[in-house]
C-alpha cells in the first residue's frame, strides 16, 4: 500500500500532526465522502459563491488537497491552534496550501461546509502523550520581519571601484542609444513605487513630488530647497551598482517623448545644486538604477508642462541640489532612496524632453557635475544611470545634439574635459554625466533653465571646482578611502530563526528503555575479562608483563582448555603449552613490551635468548606440546582437521610462518622459538603460545600482512599445509602473497623460499617458510620445528588459528577468549597483541619490527636466534632475519594468515577452512593486528576450529 488510507477519519487524526511536520510532503488526499457518494464523477460546484474567483478549479475527483472555501473556515476553526506549529501553520496554511486561494476564513461554513464531510479538520489531534516525540530537532524557520541585511558594514565601507576597461576612451565620443527598455518600467503615474517605509526619506515629499504637476517641476519638492541638492549629492555617494544608483538618483528614465527626452537629462544641469547633486551621485556607488531611484526622481510621465521643469526642478535652486546631494548620501537600494526622493520621473511630453536633456548643457555647473561624474567609478552605464538621467533614445534631431551638446559651451567643455578624465566608454561617461548631452544648442535654447541657469551654473561650477580641488586632489586618494560619509546602518538584530523546543528532549525511547544493555558479568572462569585486563594493562604498562605472564600461563591452559573440549591431547598440550606459554608469555610480554618500546626489544631479546635456552628445553615439551598443541590447535584451528592434515604442513606452516623461526628455531628455535617465540610471544615456553604469540606476532604481523597472507597463507597454509611440502607451490602462491610476507618471514628463513614463497615458485621452499624452514625446520625443526611447528603450528595454528581465526574470530574470542591464547595471544597478542602491538610492532611494524616482530619472532627468533640465529638463523637466521623481517612481516602475515591458515590451514589444513578463516582472517588478519592484540590468540585456539571452520 503506497499510502495509508489517510483520508479516513481514524487515520486523519493520527497522521495529521505528523504529516504537517514531515520533511516530505505526503500527497494528502482528502475525500469528501458525501461528494464521492453523491456525484462522484461530477465536478463539485464551487462551494462558496462569495469567492467565485477563488473557487477551486474543479474537484472533478472527490479529492482535494484542502477543504474548499467553506471548509477552510472550518479548518481554521477545527484546527484552531492545534498543538504546536501545525496548528498555527494550519490556519494560515490551509488556504494557502489548497490550490484555491481561499482566505483562511472564507466565511462561515457554507452549505458544502465540512459539516457533512469527514475531513481532517474535524479531528483534533489526540491530546494524549502519543508515541514519544521524535528526537529529531524541530527546526522551524522563523523569518524575522526585518529584511535580511545583505551587505556587511565592511562591504559598505569599502566598495569596489570599477576599474576602467581597456579601450574605454571617454574622450572619444561614442554615439549612444540607450534602449528605452533599459530603464525600469515607469511606475504608475504619481504613484511612487513602494519602498520600505524606513527607506522613505520623505514619503510625503515623494508623493508631492510625483504628483506635483507644475511646481519647480516634477521634482518640485526636491527642487524646493537646498535639501534636495544635498540629497542628491548624497545619493551619488551612495554605493551600489549603477542601476541601483540611478534609480537611486530617482530619475528612472523612462522613455520620454522625443522632445522631452532632451530636457529630461537637462534638468540636473539647471543649477549648481543639481550639479553638486550629480557630482555626489557620481560618487555614489551602486547600480545606476539604484542611485537614480535614490535621487528619487523616478520619472513618471508628467504632463508636458511639468516635464520640463521636472528635471529642472532640482536645478531650481541650490536647495534642490543640496537635497539631491543628501539623497546621494542616503544609503539603500536606489528604488528605496528614489522613492525616498520621491521624484519618480515619468516620461515627459516631447516639448519638455528637450529641456530635460538640455539642462546639463546649460552651464558649467553641469560640467562640474560631469567632471565629478567622471570621477565616479563604474561602468558608464552605471554612472550615467547613477546620474540618474537614463538616456533614452532621442529623436534624430536631438540625437545630433546629444552628441553635440558638449560642444555647446565652456561648461560643456569642462564637462567633457572631465569626462575624459572619467574612465569608461564615452557612452558610459556621458550617461554618467547624466546629461545625455543633447545638443547644447538645443539644450540651451530649449531649456527653461538656459538663461538664468547660466549664471547659477557658473557660480556653481566655481564652487564645485574649489570643492573638487580641495577635496579630491587625486583619484587615488579617493579610490582607497573608506566611504566615511555613509551613515552607519543600524544593525538589525535578526530574530533567531531557530526556536528550540521548550521542553528538553528526552533521548530515551520506549524501545531503548526496554532493552537496556547489561554489562556482561565476568565469571570466575571467564578468562576473557582477565585476559583483556591483562592486555589492556599490557598496552598501558608494557613492563608489567611478568605477573600477567604468569596468569597467562594459567590462562593459556584455560584457553587451551577451551579447545580442550576438542581434544584431550590438547589439554595435555595445553598444560605443557601453559607452562611453555607461561615462559613464553613472559617472553611474549617482553616482546609485547618491546613492541611498546624498542628499548624493551633489547630486553626482549635478552629474555628471548634466555628463554630460548629455556625454550630449548621447553621446545621439547613444546614439541610435544607443539604437536599436541598442533592438534589442539588444529582442533582449534580447523583445529584437528586442519592440523592433522595440515599438521605436517601445519607444523611446516607454522614453520613456515615460523618457518623462519622454526627452522633454526625448531631446534634452537624450538627453544628459540620458545625463546624466540617467547621472545616473540611468550615464545618458547608456550611455543604454541609462543608461537601463538609468535605466530601471533606473525599473525599479527600477518595480521596486517595476514590479510593477504592469511588468505594466501590460508591457501598457502591450507595448500601449504596440505601441500605444504607438496603444495608448496600452491601454498607458495597462496603463500606467495602470503609468503611474500610470510615468505619474507620465511623468506629469511628460506630466502629462496621467501622468494618462492613470495612467488609460489619455490613452492617447496616457499612452501612456507616451512618449505625451507620446514625443510630445515622440518628437518631440524621438522621434529622440533614440526613439533615446534606443530607446537607452533599448534601454537601458531592455535595461535594463528587462534590468532588468525582467533585473530579474526579468535580475535573475537581472543578478545573474549584469550584465556590462554588470550594469554599467549593475550600476551602474545599482547606480546603479539603487542606483537601485534609489540610483535606486530615488532612484527606489526614487523617488517621493520618483524625483524623485531620476528624480533619477537625472528628477533626473538632472530635475536633469540640471534644467538640462536646461528642455527635458526640458518634458515631463519639469515632468512629469518632477512625474510623474517620482510617475511616475517609477511610471515607474520603468513603466520597470521599462514598461521591463521597455518593454524587454520595447517590446522584444518584449513586450506579451505583456513582460507575462509584466512579470509576471515584475511580481513581478520588485518583485524587481527587490531583485534588480535586485544584478544589473545590462544583463546581463539579453542574456538579456532569453529572459527576457522566457521569463519568462512
From Swiss-Prot:
Biased composition (Pro residues): 41-55, 761-775, 903-915
GO molecular function terms noted in the UniProt entry: calmodulin binding; microtubule binding
UniProt record, GO biological process: axonal transport of mitochondrion; cytoskeleton-dependent intracellular transport; dendrite morphogenesis; lysosome localization; microtubule cytoskeleton organization; positive regulation of axonogenesis; regulation of microtubule cytoskeleton organization
Database matches in InterPro entries: MAP6
Keyword terms: Calmodulin-binding, Cell projection, Cytoplasm, Cytoplasmic vesicle, Cytoskeleton, Golgi apparatus, Lipoprotein, Membrane, Microtubule, Palmitate, Phosphoprotein, Repeat, Transport
Lineage: superkingdom: Eukaryota
Region listing for Disordered, in residue ranges: 37-457, 486-952
Mc- repeats: 222-267, 268-313, 314-359, 360-405, 406-451
Region (5 X approximate tandem repeat Mc) location: 222-451
Region (Mn 3): 473-496
Principal subcellular localization: cytoplasm
Lipidation, S-palmitoyl cysteine type: 5, 10-11
Region (Calmodulin-binding): 1-15, 124-138, 160-174, 187-201, 235-249, 280-294, 325-339, 373-387, 421-435, 481-495, 532-546, 559-573
Membrane topology: Lipid-anchor
Protein name, entry field: Microtubule-associated protein 6
Protein's organism: Rattus norvegicus (Rat)
Source taxonomy: Eukaryota, Metazoa, Chordata, Craniata, Vertebrata
Amino acid at each position: 500500500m503506497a499510502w495509508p488510507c489517510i483520508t479516513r477519519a481514524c487515520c486523519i487524526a493520527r497522521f495529521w500532526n505528523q504529516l504537517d511536520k514531515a520533511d516530505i510532503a505526503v500527497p494528502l488526499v482528502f475525500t469528501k465522502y458525501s461528494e464521492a457518494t453523491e456525484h462522484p464523477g461530477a465536478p463539485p460546484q464551487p462551494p462558496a459563491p462569495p469567492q467565485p474567483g477563488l473557487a477551486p478549479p474543479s474537484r472533478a475527483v472527490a479529492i482535494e488537497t484542502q477543504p474548499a472555501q467553506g471548509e477552510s473556515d472550518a479548518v481554521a476553526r477545527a484546527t484552531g491552534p492545534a498543538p504546536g506549529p501545525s496548528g498555527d501553520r494550519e490556519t494560515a496554511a490551509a488556504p494557502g496550501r489548497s490550490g484555491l486561494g481561499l482566505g483562511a476564513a472564507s466565511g462561515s461554513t457554507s452549505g458544502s461546509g465540512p459539516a457533512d464531510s469527514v475531513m481532517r479538520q474535524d479531528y483534533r489531534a489526540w491530546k494524549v502523550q502519543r508515541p514519544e516525540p521524535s528526537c529529531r530537532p524541530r527546526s522551524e524557520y522563523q523569518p524575522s520581519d526585518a529584511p535580511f541585511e545583505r551587505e556587511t558594514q565592511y562591504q559598505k565601507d569599502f566598495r569596489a571601484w570599477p576599474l576602467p576597461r581597456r579601450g574605454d576612451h571617454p574622450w572619444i565620443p561614442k554615439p549612444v542609444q540607450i534602449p528605452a527598455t533599459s530603464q525600469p518600467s515607469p511606475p504608475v503615474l504619481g504613484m511612487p513605487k513602494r519602498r520600505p517605509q524606513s527607506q522613505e526619506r520623505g514619503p510625503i515629499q515623494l508623493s508631492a513630488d510625483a504628483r506635483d504637476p507644475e511646481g519647480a517641476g516634477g521634482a518640485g519638492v526636491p527642487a524646493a530647497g537646498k535639501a534636495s541638492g544635498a540629497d542628491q549629492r548624497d545619493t551619488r555617494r551612495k554605493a551600489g551598482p549603477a542601476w541601483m544608483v540611478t534609480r537611486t538618483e530617482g530619475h528612472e528614465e523612462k522613455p520620454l517623448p522625443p522632445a522631452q527626452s532632451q530636457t529630461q537629462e537637462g534638468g540636473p544641469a539647471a543649477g549648481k545644486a543639481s550639479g553638486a547633486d550629480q557630482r555626489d551621485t557620481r560618487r555614489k556607488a551602486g547600480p545606476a538604477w539604484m542611485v537614480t531611484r535614490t535621487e528619487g526622481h523616478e520619472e513618471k510621465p508628467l504632463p508636458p508642462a511639468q516635464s520640463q521643469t521636472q528635471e529642472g526642478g532640482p536645478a531650481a535652486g541650490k536647495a534642490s541640489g543640496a537635497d539631491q546631494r543628501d539623497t546621494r548620501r542616503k544609503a539603500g537600494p536606489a528604488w528605496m532612496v528614489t522613492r525616498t526622493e520621491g521624484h519618480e520621473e515619468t516620461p515627459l511630453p516631447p516639448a519638455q524632453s528637450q529641456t530635460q536633456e538640455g539642462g546639463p548643457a546649460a552651464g558649467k555647473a553641469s560640467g562640474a557635475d560631469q567632471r565629478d561624474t567622471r570621477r565616479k567609478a563604474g561602468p558608464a552605464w552605471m554612472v550615467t544611470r547613477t546620474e540618474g538621467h537614463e538616456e533614452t533614445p532621442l529623436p534624430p534631431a536631438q540625437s545630433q545634439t546629444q552628441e553635440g551638446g558638449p560642444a555647446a559651451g565652456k561648461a560643456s567643455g569642462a564637462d567633457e574635459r572631465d569626462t575624459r578624465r572619467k574612465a569608461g566608454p564615452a557612452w558610459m561617461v556621458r550617461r554618467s554625466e547624466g546629461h545625455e548631452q543633447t545638443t547644447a544648442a538645443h539644450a540651451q535654447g530649449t531649456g527653461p533653465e538656459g538663461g538664468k541657469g547660466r549664471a547659477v551654473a557658473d557660480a556653481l561650477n566655481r564652487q564645485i571646482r574649489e570643492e573638487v580641488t580641495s577635496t579630491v586632489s587625486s583619484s587615488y586618494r579617493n579610490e582607497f578611502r573608506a566611504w566615511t560619509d555613509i551613515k552607519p546602518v543600524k544593525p538589525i538584530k535578526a530574530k533567531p530563526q531557530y526556536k528550540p523546543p521548550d521542553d528538553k528532549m528526552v533521548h530515551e525511547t520506549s524501545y531503548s528503555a526496554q532493552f537496556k544493555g547489561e554489562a556482561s558479568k565476568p565469571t570466575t572462569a571467564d578468562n576473557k575479562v582477565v585476559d583483556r585486563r591483562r592486555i589492556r594493562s599490557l598496552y598501558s604498562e608494557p613492563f608489567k608483563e611478568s605477573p600477567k605472564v604468569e596468569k597467562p600461563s594459567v590462562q593459556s591452559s584455560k584457553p587451551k582448555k577451551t579447545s580442550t573440549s576438542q581434544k584431550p591431547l590438547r589439554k595435555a598440550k595445553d598444560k605443557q603449552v601453559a607452562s611453555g606459554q607461561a615462559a613464553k608469555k613472559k617472553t611474549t610480554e617482553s616482546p609485547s613490551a618491546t613492541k611498546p618500546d624498542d628499548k624493551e626489544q633489547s630486553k626482549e631479546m635478552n629474555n628471548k635468548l634466555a628463554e630460548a635456552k629455556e625454550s630449548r628445553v621447553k621446545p621439547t615439551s613444546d614439541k610435544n606440546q607443539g604437536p599436541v598443541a598442533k592438534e589442539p590447535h588444529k582442533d582449534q584451528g580447523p583445529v584437528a582437521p586442519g592440523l592433522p592434515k595440515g599438521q605436517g604442513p601445519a607444523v611446516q606452516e607454522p614453520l613456515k610462518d615460523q618457518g623462519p623461526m622454526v627452522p633454526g628455531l625448531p631446534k634452537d628455535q624450538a627453544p628459540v622459538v620458545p625463546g624466540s617465540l617467547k621472545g616473540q610471544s611468550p615464545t618458547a615456553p608456550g611455543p604454541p603460545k609462543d608461537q601463538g604469540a609468535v605466530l601471533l606476532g606473525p599473525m599479527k604481523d600477518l595480521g596486517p600482512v595476514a590479510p593477504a597472507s592469511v588468505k594466501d597463507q590460508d591457501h598457502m597454509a591450507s595448500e601449504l599445509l596440505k601441500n605444504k611440502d607438496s603444495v608448496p607451490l600452491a601454498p607458495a602462491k597462496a603463500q606467495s602473497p602470503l609468503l611474500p610476507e610470510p615468505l619474507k618471514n620465511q623468506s629469511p628463513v628460506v630466502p629462496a623460499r621467501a622468494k618462492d614463497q613470495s612467488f609460489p615458485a619455490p613452492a617447496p621452499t616457499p612452501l612456507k617458510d616451512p618449505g625451507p624452514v620446514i625443510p630445515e625446520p622440518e628437518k631440524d625443526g621438522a621434529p622440533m620445528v614440526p613439533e615446534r611447528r606443530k607446537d607452533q603450528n599448534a601454537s601458531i595454528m592455535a595461535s594463528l588459528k587462534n590468532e588468525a581465526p582467533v585473530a579474526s574470530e579468535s580475535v573475537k574470542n581472543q578478545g573474549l577468549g584469550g584465556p590462554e591464547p588470550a594469554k599467549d595471544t593475550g600476551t602474545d597478542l599482547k606480546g603479539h597483541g603487542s606483537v601485534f602491538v609489540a610483535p606486530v610492532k615488532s612484527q606489526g611494524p614487523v617488517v621493520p619490527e618483524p625483524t623485531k616482530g620476528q624480533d619477537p619472532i625472528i628477533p626473538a627468533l632472530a635475536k633469540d636466534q640471534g644467538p640462536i640465529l646461528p642455527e635458526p638463523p640458518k634458515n631463519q637466521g639469515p632468512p629469518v632475519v632477512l625474510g623474517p623481517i620482510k617475511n616475517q612481516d609477511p610471515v607474520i602475515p603468513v603466520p597470521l594468515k599462514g598461521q591463521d591458515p597455518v593454524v587454520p590451514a595447517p590446522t584444518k589444513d584449513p586450506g579451505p577452512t583456513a582460507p575462509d578463516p584466512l579470509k576471515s582472517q584475511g580481513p581478520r588478519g588485518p583485524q587481527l593486528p587490531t583485534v588480535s592484540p586485544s584478544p589473545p590468540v590462544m583463546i581463539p585456539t579453542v574456538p579456532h576450529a569453529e572459527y576457522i571452520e566457521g569463519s568462512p
